[in-house]
Design a protein with these regions (language model features):
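Feature captures the RNA virus RNA-dependent RNA polymerase
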Residues: 19-34, 38, 191-192, 199-200, ...
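Active-site-flanking structural segment that lines cofactor/substrate pockets
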Residues: 34-71
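Short acidic/polar active-site loop segments enriched in Thr and Asp
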Residues: 76, 218, 253
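Glycine-enriched loop-and-adjacent helix/strand subsegments that border the catalytic/binding cleft
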Residues: 66-76, 80-215
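Glycine-rich phosphate-binding loops at beta-strand->alpha-helix junctions
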Residues: 225-233
Length: 277
């Protein structure tokens, strides 16, 4: 991680460089991560017997993943990503979902590498389109070594756990999409109506499920994808998740929507609980 880091991020950088186990895990994840471009991946599904448990919780993403991973399950966590900047605003102290994942794990060091800049981030920058596309990056065996809380706390090494992370960007519906966390996202709001947005999300969320299924995930940790900084309407997003997951209820053991919220900001959780709970 670069020079713009505040104290906690500097500690993460130093820890990942100095601890052999973390260095080795970063290298292994980099060697085995897969970029699924927009039209890649056929609909491969291994059917299981019972229907998946579908859960809506108020947890943070890694907080939700921890008990499954600790029990030996193959867990895939969706990263609500910046399409144009590795880790979003993590190096500047921002605190959305992607930044939280990067602060607690080795993920940033899998995203911020030359081949991913060339194949994932720079092509999105050249699009200059805040709707982005369906590209997904699947990173196996990311090591979570901090507790996923507002101020992440280092876990004892025996409690570190691996998760797979699926990186994908929701459409950026901000009035002014371009900022330091999302460079080259365009300076005008996306021209899209609710029907078009629904179709776009159906394609993108469908791709997320396909990739996770193709990679053999047993537990899928999702959430209010794009409903925070990217301003997607939670009712539309939750409805699309409900539609798409119907085809995957016998593919995963558990699908958990981890919709973290504060006491003041409960809309996303309330909507997801109403639609999917």
């Amino acid at each position: 991680i670069g020079s713009g880091l505040v104290g906690s991020e500097m500690c993460i950088r130093d820890r990942c460089r100095k601890i052999e186990r973390l260095r080795d895990c970063i290298k292994e994840s980099n060697n085995n991560q897969t970029l699924y471009l927009e039209k890649d991946v056929s609909d491969i599904k291994t059917q299981r017997g019972d229907a998946a448990d579908v859960i809506v919780s108020g947890k943070r993403s890694f907080e939700a993943a921890a008990p499954y991973a600790s029990a030996g399950k193959k867990v895939c966590v969706l990263n609500f990503a910046s399409a144009t900047n590795p880790g979003g605003g993590v190096v500047n102290g921002s605190s959305a979902q992607e930044e939280a994942l990067c602060r607690c794990s080795t993920l940033y060091f899998n995203l911020n590498i030359p081949c991913m800049m060339d194949k994932f981030y720079n092509p999105h920058r050249k699009m200059n389109n805040p709707l982005y596309n369906d590209d997904c990056l699947y990173t196996p065996k990311v090591i979570v070594f901090k507790k996923d809380v507002l101020f992440p706390e280092l876990l004892p090494e025996k409690e570190w756990y691996p998760v797979d992370v699926l990186t994908c960007a929701a459409p950026n519906l901000r009035r002014y999409p371009n900022n330091f966390m999302n460079p080259n996202a365009g300076d005008k709001p996306a021209a899209i109506d609710e029907h078009q947005l629904t179709e776009l999300l159906r394609s993108r969320i469908g791709k997320i499920f396909k990739v996770a299924a193709n990679e053999g995930a047993e537990v899928l940790i999702l959430g209010a994808f794009g409903c925070g900084a990217f301003c997607n309407p939670p009712q539309v997003v939750a409805n699309v998740f409900k539609q798409v997951q119907q085809d995957y209820l016998h593919v995963f053991d558990t699908i958990e929507y981890a919709v973290f919220h504060t006491e003041r900001e409960t809309e996303n959780y309330r909507v997801f609980k109403s639609v999917l709970g």
